[in-house]
From Swiss-Prot:
Homodimer. Interacts with host TRIM25 (via coiled coil); this interaction specifically inhibits TRIM25 multimerization and TRIM25-mediated RIGI CARD ubiquitination. Interacts with human EIF2AK2/PKR, CPSF4, IVNS1ABP and PABPN1. Upon interferon induction, ISGylated via host HERC5; this results in the impairment of NS1 interaction with RNA targets due to its inability to form homodimers and to interact with host EIF2AK2/PKR. One of its GO terms (cellular component) is host cell cytoplasm. A motif (Nuclear localization signal) lies at residues 34-38. The lineage of its organism: Viruses, Riboviria, Orthornavirae, Negarnaviricota, Polyploviricotina. Residues 204-230 are annotated as: Disordered. The keyword Magnesium does not apply. Belongs to the influenza A viruses NS1 family. This is Non-structural protein 1. Its main location: host cell. Residues 1-73 are annotated as: RNA-binding and homodimerization.
C-alpha cells in the first residue's frame, strides 16, 4: 500500500476529529455540519477499503499534524492561506431536505464513476426539479455534496451522491450523472428541470425551461443506457 495513501487517510481522520470537537461545541453552521456528516461516511468507506482502523489512524494523523505545526512559521502560514483559492458552498436544499429519509417503490441504482445514481421508476407524469448542494471554485462546480430530485409536492424521487469508498469527481462526472438521472426520469414521461444555480455553475449557462444544454449525441446515449437497464 502506498505510504502517501495511508498518511493522507490518517491526516483526514484527525482533521475530521478536530472538526467534530468544534461541532460538539455547537459552533458549526449548516454547511459545516453537512460536510462533517458526509466526510464521516467517506472516511468509513476509505478505512474499510484500506483495511485501517479509524481510531488508530486518527492518533497517527495527530502526530503528523503536530510535527507540521511545529515546523510552520506564522509567516509561512499566512503565505499558504493567501495562495490557496477559496471555494464557496452553494445550497439549493435546506438541511431538512438533505437529511430527510426517502423510499422507492421501484428502486433503480446505477454507479457512474465515483457517483451513485438512484431513482424511483414508479414515478410517472410528474414535474420534477433537480436541486443540489455543492462547492464552487473558479466559478465552476468543484465537489457535489448531494443532488436530489423533487416533485412539485416535495417528494424525493431521485438522488446523486458521491460514493464514500471512491472519493473525488469532476464537473464532467456530475454532468454525466445528471444526464443519466434525467434520462431515467423522463423515460416514464416525467418533466425534469434543473435548478438555475446548478445549471450556472455546472454548464456555465442556464435555460428558462430548466433544461441543461446537453448535446443531442449525449441525450441519445443516455436514453439507450436507461432503456437497456430497465
Amino acid at each position: 500500500m502506498d505510504s502517501n495513501t495511508v498518511s493522507s487517510f490518517q491526516v483526514d481522520c484527525f482533521l475530521w476529529h478536530v472538526r467534530k470537537r468544534f461541532a460538539d461545541q455547537e459552533l458549526g453552521d449548516a454547511p459545516f455540519l453537512d460536510r462533517l456528516r458526509r466526510d464521516q461516511k467517506s472516511l468509513r468507506g476509505r478505512g474499510s477499503t484500506l483495511g485501517l482502523d479509524i481510531e488508530t489512524a486518527t492518533r497517527a494523523g495527530k502526530q503528523i499534524v503536530e510535527r507540521i505545526l511545529e515546523e510552520e512559521s506564522d509567516e509561512a502560514l499566512k503565505m499558504t492561506i493567501a495562495s490557496v483559492p477559496a471555494s464557496r458552498y452553494l445550497t439549493d436544499m435546506t438541511l431538512e431536505e438533505m437529511s430527510r429519509d426517502w423510499f422507492m417503490l421501484m428502486p433503480k441504482q446505477k454507479v457512474a464513476g465515483s457517483l451513485c445514481i438512484r431513482m424511483d421508476q414508479a414515478i410517472m407524469d410528474k414535474n420534477i426539479i433537480l436541486k443540489a448542494n455543492f462547492s464552487v471554485i473558479f466559478d465552476r462546480l468543484e465537489t457535489l455534496i448531494l443532488l436530489r430530485a423533487f416533485t412539485e409536492e416535495g417528494a424525493i424521487v431521485g438522488e446523486i451522491s458521491p460514493l464514500p469508498s471512491l472519493p473525488g469527481h469532476t464537473d464532467e462526472d456530475v454532468k454525466n450523472a445528471i444526464g443519466v438521472l434525467i434520462g431515467g426520469l423522463e423515460w416514464n414521461d416525467n418533466t425534469v428541470r434543473v435548478s438555475e444555480t446548478l445549471q450556472r455553475f455546472t454548464w456555465r449557462s442556464s435555460n428558462e425551461d430548466g433544461r441543461p444544454p446537453l448535446p443531442p449525441k449525449q441525450k441519445r446515449k443516455m436514453a439507450r443506457t436507461i432503456e437497456s437497464e430497465v
